[in-house]
């Protein structure tokens, strides 16, 4: 048993605790309260006092691509054209060896740990790279084996067999901390027949799914009209595209994919009707505001998602499109852009965005019975954020100090399942 104390403890599911503490017993949280209370309850337990800091649940980055960490900045010259960005990404990826990709994934995982992330929802063409990286760094997460470019219904059965084989091989490597799922990339890169096969398999075998959906205007145009930049993918490979004449969310519902309760990444171009369908099917959303903005895709209606009762978590996306994995920075950007939307009557609070970055992400990945809040019996996944920087004080409200005056460089310590996986030089 060890007690971690700080000026502020944020359980997330209850009010902040001043002069608070968290008792950690093995891999779990034993108790949360004031330091005085926990000292009385556990008089023989050592105390680690982090001082001017906040202890909160570890951040859950529910949408990332760790295996392309080495492409940070390499695609910035084409990000004004999403189709060109995707083509260049695949070209550069083809030049990397397996060793390169595995090393990139480890670097990305370590960056996340140093930023207070304790859990990832990571997507990879080489799923084993992300899985090995999370294991090596000591992180928790779900690694989603991604499809290749597979829009041709004529090859759907073969494409599915290859994907299922990769998934089943990956599943043999699951641990208590790292689990696996599937990621049919998007409505514009995966054929309808393959989507149906994956959905049937996921329901039968209880496989978690994540999908890029309604990310860009190009995607919505392709599905609604059968035209636009993404039609070029089909023309390039001499493939036929029969437009379903609907939104991406309606399309996924028609194919039975929404009934698998997938985690939908981005959802920039969604209507009130789309959100209603997402909620009704129990699907979730990974909100990636910085990546969306960097591409110029638009503002995802974050506040409308919350008002609709949809489960929402935060994602950094890859550092090839965002450049950093910093959930504090992502939180700040999410709050500011939501507040600044024209016609928005919803004022997102710092408390709401911290809940989204922790418990929201845990719910989005289906892990909220284990992580996402500091409660007795839950896993001891936590981060300690220093509040001693001159630019952070005075601390009038700990939520606003964290969201609007802190970033990943203020992370002092990160713990997963009771094991410290990162400690800053200042904290050492």
Q: What name fits each language-model region?
A:
Residues 255-257, 300-389, 405-406:
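His/Asp/Glu-enriched, well-ordered alpha-helical/loop segment
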